[in-house]
Amino acid sequence: MITFMNNSDSEDEPCNERTSLMSAESPPVPSYQDGLQASETREAQTHRKRQTGSSRSPNNVADEDASDSDVRVRESALENEEEELTLKYGAKHVIMLFVPVTLCMIVVVATIKSVRFYTEKNGQLIYTPFSEDTPSVGQRLLNSVLNTIIMISVIVVMTVFLVVLYKYRCYKFIHGWLILSSFMLLFLFTYIYLGEVLKTYNVAMDYPTVILIIWNFGAVGMIRIHWKGPLQLQQAYLIMISALMVLVFIKYLPEWSAWVILGAISIYDLIAVLCPKGPLRMLXETAQERNQPIFPALIYSSAMIWTVGMAKPDTAAKGQSQQAWDAEDERENHSSTSHSDSQILDTRSPAPSHPITLEEMEEEERGVKLGLGDFIFYSVLVGKAAATPSGDWNTTLAXXVAILIGLCLTLLLLAVFKKALPALPISITFGLIFYFSTDNLVRTDPLEISV
């Protein structure tokens, strides 16, 4: 038996089945008339909608078709414009990178062919402790592999260390590290290079003149690389620094170890750039998240990026572009979260004195960046091809052309995928294939020529 009790009823009041049913509140039951009225209302609304849809004039339909066609035309025009820009700037960037890479290789090959100091083997790097002066081919191959493992391990450790410093905003330490490296290259290595060139060509020069030349060369380079100056001057100094580093590698790297290191470094570059947790990829992503440029001592840029890396302009300057410049710089200063960030902003170059239009800024931003490590290993391959006893101009030119072809393909892939790509694998692979095939198949015999 089911009982139902209302609050108004007494607890002692008995109830039977009839009184329980009478006191219970039942929901109202919809009647037939209500359902009929609701259905008529829905039919009337549907009929009005159909009349409204059928009453549209042909002009409205034509206008909608015309607007759709205009949208399609604009989309196709934008796609065509994007393709034209890709072709235009793709070809432009190929030339902008071919020139510095070729200049670096020319400096290295010219030095190797003329200065005997860089082809004499009188020592090895501390990173390649195993000697290759053994009669056994197997032992020599093993030593070259061991040297490669040590060299690649050092590169990996130093790269990870740099990424950790950058991630935790240790900008002062990185600046000091790069300044010290640039100082050694621009002063010490340049002094050695100049001395050997003067000795080779039997040019006498007193020490005060040499010191004055080295001081001017190094001081201007330090100012331009780590502070401000013309873009072309920075590019020239970066090419010279790369060439000096290449000559050191060519002199002190054993022959077999150099070839194995070139193959291994291309594989490491592929992993470091494309893997999600690769150190070079993490470095680039961190720089993009913070909207900061990577240090100029590590990167060769084919164009100046005005919107990144500029200090506060003169407040007395007028004009709309100058005011926009101040607003952008103020936002960057407010977005900095540490004292190290302000140090980065303070070392930036000043704003240009002439007003910069939006077209000029977009034109300048379309630049390609190539790591100096890529410059160095490109030229190491060509320099080693020129420095080997069996190396002639055929193998040297073949290696250089192969590197440029690989660089062109890399830039093509860069335009397709529109993300950071490793620059070493394709070029180094082509260079090694062209070098060894040319050295073994296209070698010229002097006796046959004389006959």
Curated annotation (Swiss-Prot):
Q: Describe its assembly.
A: Homodimer. Component of the gamma-secretase complex, a complex composed of a presenilin homodimer (PSEN1 or PSEN2), nicastrin (NCSTN), APH1 (APH1A or APH1B) and PEN2. Such minimal complex is sufficient for secretase activity, although other components may exist.
Q: Which organism is it from?
A: Gallus gallus
Instruction: Report the domain remarks.
Output: The PAL motif is required for normal active site conformation.
Q: Which family does it belong to?
A: Belongs to the peptidase A22A family.
Q: Name one GO biological process term.
A: membrane protein ectodomain proteolysis
Motif PAL, residue numbers: 422-424
State the name under which the record lists this protein. Presenilin-2
Q: Which residue windows does the record flag with biased composition (Polar residues)?
A: 335-346
Q: Which UniProt keywords apply?
A: Endoplasmic reticulum, Golgi apparatus, Hydrolase, Membrane, Notch signaling pathway, Protease, Transmembrane, Transmembrane helix
